[in-house]
Design a protein with these regions (language model features):
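A short, structured surface patch at a secondary-structure boundary
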Residues: 63-113, 117-123
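Extracytoplasmic substrate-binding proteins
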Residues: 49-50, 129-203, 224-228
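Proline-aspartate-enriched helix->loop->beta-strand connector
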Residues: 107-120, 139, 239-252
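Solvent-exposed loop/turn segments at secondary-structure junctions
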Residues: 65-68, 83-86, 117-126, 146-151, ...
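Alpha-helical, coiled-coil/dimerization segments enriched in small aliphatic residues
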Residues: 84-89, 206-235
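Bacterial Sec-exported substrate-binding components of ABC uptake systems
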Residues: 2-8, 22-65, 166-197, 246
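Short helix-initiation/N-cap motifs at beta->coil->alpha
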Residues: 45-47, 96-107, 230-239
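Bacterial N-terminal signal peptides
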Residues: 11-20
Length: 253
């Protein structure tokens, strides 16, 4: 899956990755080789929790953007939340289980996928509410906070550590970071006024320069986000408020 962020100002794409799990090398001692291949990888998630996984084969993602990141890391999912299809239109196999909406995850559906690794969001309370249940069942679960490209890099780094494909971290992380730096250098210094709108099935909200990927990209390019410090836009969005602000560009995701 490829997604453009802010097409008018930044021509970079999160490129899809093909990633494979660790496999054991042939040896006379098959048991020992299998143990090496299944060695635990331990990392710290964005809640400060230590999480250990061993080549997970059945991954469930609790928000669509993390489904995307896991797929972009070359992983596969056995279960994913509804917005993986509804909002992101990800091309998932027919046998992937829909585990419910982001704010209303279905625990029964999640468990029916028989997950050996679950990925959730720090910023989504419905994800956090399930953490204790996952832990009590002995299912490894990690929570990430991805609101900017650096956060994406951090998560990608962990995902490629899990799969052992650090070449893909360079190709789809560090190389993209360089593309961003090159794009920033090309900014003409005109500092256009912009409005960034994020849409969902039930709402449209104006987003500022911080706490979201697109807002940070626009800020890096020298754009002035009219939602920054503008309560009429950020808290009570209306067509009248947009027309009054009169931005040069409007970006919608």
């Amino acid at each position: 899956m490829k997604r453009n962020f802010c097409k008018k100002l930044l021509p970079f794409v999160f490129i899809g990755i093909i990633m494979t799990g660790c496999t054991a090398k042939s040896s006379d001692n098959n048991i020992e080789s299998a143990q090496i291949a299944q060695a635990e990888y331990t990392f710290t998630d964005d809640l400060g929790r230590e999480v250990s996984v061993s080549s997970p084969k059945s991954v469930v993602t609790l928000i669509g953007s993390f489904t995307d990141i896991w797929l972009l890391s070359g992983g596969t999912v056995t279960g994913a939340c509804d917005d993986s299809w509804a909002s992101l239109n990800l091309d998932l196999p027919d046998n992937v289980i829909n585990t419910g909406k982001v704010k209303e995850p279905n625990l029964e559906s999640i468990l029916s996928a028989e997950p050996d690794f679950i990925i959730g969001s720090v910023k989504t309370s419905s994800n956090l509410d399930l953490m204790e249940t996952f832990e009590s069942l002995g299912i490894p679960c990690a929570y990430f906070d991805v609101t900017g490209f650096d956060d994406y890099l951090d998560m990608l780094n962990i995902c490629t550590d899990i799969t052992g494909r650090k070449d893909l971290y360079k190709a789809n992380g560090l190389d993209v970071q360089q593309q961003i730096a090159n794009a920033v250098k090309k900014a003409d210094g005109s500092s256009p006024e912009v409005l960034y709108l994020r849409t969902s099935a039930s709402s449209v909200t104006a987003k500022g320069s911080e706490g979201n990927v697109c807002g940070e990209i626009l800020s890096d390019l020298g754009c002035i986000n009219i939602a920054d410090g503008n309560a009429a836009l950020s808290e009570n969005l209306s067509l009248e408020a947009i027309l009054q602000a009169d931005p040069d560009y409007i970006f919608v995701t």
